[in-house]
Curated annotation (Swiss-Prot):
Gene Ontology molecular function terms on file: ATP binding; GMP synthase activity
Organism: Archaeoglobus fulgidus (strain ATCC 49558 / DSM 4304 / JCM 9628 / NBRC 100126 / VC-16)
UniProt-annotated binding residues for ATP: S28, G29, G30, V31, D32, S33, S34
Superkingdom of this protein's organism: Archaea
Origin organism lineage: Archaea, Methanobacteriati, Methanobacteriota, Archaeoglobi, Archaeoglobales
Protein name: GMP synthase [glutamine-hydrolyzing] subunit B
Amino acid sequence: MDVEKFVENAIKEIRERVKDGKAIIALSGGVDSSVCTVLAHKALGDRLIPVFVDTGLMREGEPEKIKEIFGNMGLVFIDAKEEFFKALKGVTDPEEKRKVIGELFVRIFERVAEEHNAEYLIQGTIYPDIIESQGGIKSHHNVGGFPTSYKFKDVIEPLRELYKDEVREVARYLGLPKEISERMPFPGPGLAVRIVGEVTPEKVEIVRKANKIVEEELADYDKWQCFAALIGKATGVKGDVRVWGYIIAVRAVESRDGMTADPIKIDYDRLRRIALRITGEIDKVSRVVYDITPKPPATIEYE
């Protein structure tokens, strides 16, 4: 890929489609939305309004990190935790979850756009998002989960033809910090799709803590992605007392573009340490398993 040519064309496309108007951009802090934000900022300057929505479904410390990196671009920070938990109450179907989240994201963006007199939405959709949504594998919140009715004049997706490894190339070319350019993929719906079943504040806090432990313990492994997911409940024993606790699945894979993936081989002692830390540091977890399923037949994320 000719990265320089891509950047030049992406900036040109954004300018041509937004013209003299204003645009808001959905910023999550991931490499896709971060690259999109830098490209759009180069194209529009202060006519771009970056919006970060704190859904309550982010990893530990993520909202604070976003403020630190993008605060100088006029970042609009929206605390929508209560809205998201209310909207997800009672929802157990993964497709419905993604649609609920996609719908709420867009309605929040519409509110911000109205306040700033912006008519365009820019988002960091990449090619695998489109393939999986169109193929019926899973609806990505910014594609299949995107509502059919919205108030924007146009939705612009400059990265729609790129794979993740190509987006990383662009990030490096643009000089984004390594913590962004090499950041592990994180789903747009956040920790909601790392919880099988209904999403509750308690489950989110558990999976957030478990995710942090997994990332810490596997920091020295070469991987595409690693994370923890809450997948159900099982009987356990803590302090000679029976407990009915949560099951945490650990997932760690290698991949080039996310379309296929293989589980990485983790040293047994490391896996045991992860299990002991998660069950020891998180009261309501009774069991930890390591998922060794490749993609296909599994997807990388659980929902």
